[in-house]
């Protein structure tokens, strides 16, 4: 059924249909009785899916990835739609319009998206107001990054300002230094630059802090960031952001679309490689959140058994539809029961343990 609906939705430009569908979701879930009904139908209800991660209780491991709800306008929607949590943002200290449109494109033959949104958002102050005025039913993380207009010399202060505004209202914070759509941002993944940013954010908030990394960095850079995260006692790492690689894409005319980060199945292989490397280096000393190319319950299960405590999706939601979170959670629950696992936590990294 959703295939037919998706075909119709895809007749409209991506950013336009995103705005329309998001408005509809907010409207429906603004009604308490409908919100409760949706959560009863779609929500992760099996207790085996619940886990406590960095002191936060998650009813299910699959969350909405950053980028869909940039300004926290749908805080009440995500639990009702079956997600175990949501990460809102990316938000910057100051409002900014992002890059010129068109800036989002579908790659249907790859079941992928290409975006160069450029962190369009209303600013951390506006998001703080949203967070203060709503009580979501699931944990809400906030993804923060640098305002494009902020000089490099004030980068740390920019991140600190965002952390100061939204930190007290978030379940956790993610420091984003890995988007390909802000000039120079990925350079901040260099350890000495990243150290200063993370120390600044940690000084501003008491909530768990994670860092989000790119799939396109080298293995040695991954190791350096991982060691820094352990040294600074971060809560964890989100892996990975979108990729700039165009390898193996089959959608015609991709070069004509211009620059941007690609999400969905084309990033899946590298996302798994990064996850396995991270878990092999730190085990359970850091919480690992895996994102990138998760489409099916099998994909989700592979990430969990490879070491991910939590998962995120965005492109899978676009291509999979409103029942996608439920299908993923139901599939994970079934595999937990079939495998004799008493809890989700028991399954995390289990494939790695068996291979040793």
From Swiss-Prot:
It is a peripheral membrane protein. One of its GO terms (cellular component) is cytoplasm. It is an enzyme of class 1 (oxidoreductase). Substrate binds at residues 70, 115-119, 176, 181, 241-242. GO terms for molecular function: dihydroorotate dehydrogenase (quinone) activity. FMN binds at residues 66-70, 90, 143, 176, 212, 240, 264, 293, 314-315. One of its GO terms (biological process) is 'de novo' pyrimidine nucleobase biosynthetic process. The active site is at residue 179. Its EC number is 1.3.5.2. Its cofactor is FMN. PROSITE patterns: DHODEHASE_1, DHODEHASE_2. NCBIfam families: PRK05286.2-1, PRK05286.2-5, pyrD_sub2. Belongs to the dihydroorotate dehydrogenase family. Type 2 subfamily. Monomer. This is Dihydroorotate dehydrogenase (quinone). The gene is pyrD.
